[in-house]
Amino acid sequence: MSDNSKTRVVVGMSGGVDSSVTALLLKEQGYDVIGIFMKNWDDTDENGVCTATEDYKDVVAVADQIGIPYYSVNFEKEYWDRVFEYFLAEYRAGRTPNPDVMCNKEIKFKAFLDYAITLGADYVATGHYARVVRDEDGTVHMLRGVDNGKDQTYFLSQLSQEQLQKTMFPLGHLEKPEVRKLAEEAGLSTAKKKDSTGICFIGEKNFKNFLSNYLPAQPGRMMTVDGRDMGEHAGLMYYTIGQRGGLGIGGQHGGDNAPWFVVGKALSKNILYVGQGFYHDSLMSTSLEASQVHFTCDMPEEFTLECTAKFRYRQPDSKVTVHVKGDKAEVIFAEPQRAITPGQAVVFYDGEECLGGGLIDNAYRDGQVCQYI
């Protein structure tokens, strides 16, 4: 049996149950474990309570319980520069970004990893539901978490081979109820703490109010694809392709009671396009273009791949053909797909393995670009 005590693992601890159990398992396996709390956002709420302070107290309590040293590190500047500025720029461009993908790439597995190495880390570990397996030649492959409902490889798809080489995901082989049970059996103070929801820097806040603090809203016309005026929208940034709620038009226009959906945006004219029916023609596409395409293992500069893909988190896989050229890709769908959204991640899979992914730039319907931005 190998002696893990000489291997230092620095754990990103958020104050939640997943990262608490991650630290616990590594400690039980004999590793030299250090807990780190990352403060990425100044999130004082309207009552003057900073939730990060409460979360850090939970980290301290758990670290003391399991007997590991802990530190707090401030990445607010890195987060603002590398994640939040990107988030705002994407909304300005009419797209719908996924900040969690960028946060993992730039903060949790870059800024945090760099910091952990200064502490002598051999590995970093997080509470993500994913798995890493190492080939005999040392190549690391990332697999989906065993808990299909919690699998987070979609958000980890931009990680590089170098980052994965230094990473452990101790929860990848567990289901969420098992993690809670382990926390309860160990008497961890976070055992019953509810999972955090929403974008990390918004949390439970009203998204519209939050965004309007940083980007001025520009109301404009809401129209059908064939030019019927449907009233006013509150600002293109508040709507995403395929969205149903928040349009304020219901079944009031015409006799058809089918629900209304956002089917497109014209950024230059500040028009929001809407249409009736979940599978409205304007929501369906047959291919997409992606940039910032990246694979977790070394791949040729140009190649074609038959695999499956996800276009949003918790979506079933769809069969695709991917034509890759440098960091760009054309992704052709075996079956038409609904509400492909510029700014979101497209992530590629071969069975259990997450191969990598990219960011969606445009959707196409039979060769014609969809008017999504």
From Swiss-Prot:
Binding site for ATP: G12, M13, S14, G15, G16, V17, D18, S19, M38, G127
GO BP, sorted A to Z: tRNA wobble position uridine thiolation
UniProtKB keywords: ATP-binding, Cytoplasm, Disulfide bond, Nucleotide-binding, RNA-binding, Transferase, tRNA processing, tRNA-binding
GO cellular component terms attached to this protein's record: cytoplasm
Disulphide-bonded residues: C103-C200
Listed CDD domains: MnmA_TRMU-like
Reaction equation(s) it catalyzes: S-sulfanyl-L-cysteinyl-[protein] + uridine(34) in tRNA + AH2 + ATP = 2-thiouridine(34) in tRNA + L-cysteinyl-[protein] + A + AMP + diphosphate + H(+)
Role description: Catalyzes the 2-thiolation of uridine at the wobble position (U34) of tRNA, leading to the formation of s(2)U34.
Protein name (database record): tRNA-specific 2-thiouridylase MnmA
